[in-house]
Amino acid sequence: VKELDLAWSFKFDTARGMEATPIMHNGVLYVSTGWSHVHAINARTGAELWHYDAEVPKAHLAKTCCGPVNRGVAIWQKDEMSPLQVFFGSLDGRLIAIDALTGEENWSVQSTPTDGNYSITGAPRIVKDMVIIGNGGGELGVRGYISAYDVSSGEMRWRFYTVPGDRNKPQESEALEKALS
């Protein structure tokens, strides 16, 4: 241990502290930072391979409780013949798929309503060819849910509400009906 030394360091262009854990795949670190930026960094040299900026409007900060944070990415590849993709949620509620080799956007979907205090700060998960993502904003009174999107197309497969909606309207499930009784 006493012979260990710093191999390299990388300065992210953000004044906000980092809350994401990098993911490493084939010698590349993928990490998200504040304001919905994603970086691919060569793990051996520390050289930036690409940088993606979701270009979230600064005015969206007013719709969040806890600052312009982003807590991580997910990576997925169906097989060796398929493209490796990086997925993350943007502060303004989009779920975005990026080509892991080039940093180019493959697709983007608006996962949250644009007229409320919704955001996405959490990292997505990949399950059975679906990207699973939740929403943020519960601290500001929005309704929570978890959604699944097709990894290839971005088409929504399902949405599960975690809290009941308007008590004067039918709920999406028996469990939500029981929660109101």
Predicted regions and their residues:
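Aromatic (tryptophan-biased) beta-strands that constitute blades/sheets of beta-rich domains
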Residues: V1-F12, A47-A62, E104-P113, E155-V163, ...
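Beta-propeller blade signature
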Residues: I98, T102-G103, G144-M156
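Surface-exposed, flexible loop/turn segments at secondary-structure boundaries
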Residues: F12, H37, P57, M81, ...
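Generic hydrophobic/packing signal
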Residues: T33, N42-T45, Y52-V56, Q77-D79, ...
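Accessory beta-strand-rich segments of carbohydrate-active enzymes
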Residues: G93-R94, D99, G103-N106, I132
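Repeat-blade elements of multi-bladed beta-propeller folds
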Residues: G17-H37, K63-R94, S119-R143, L180-S181
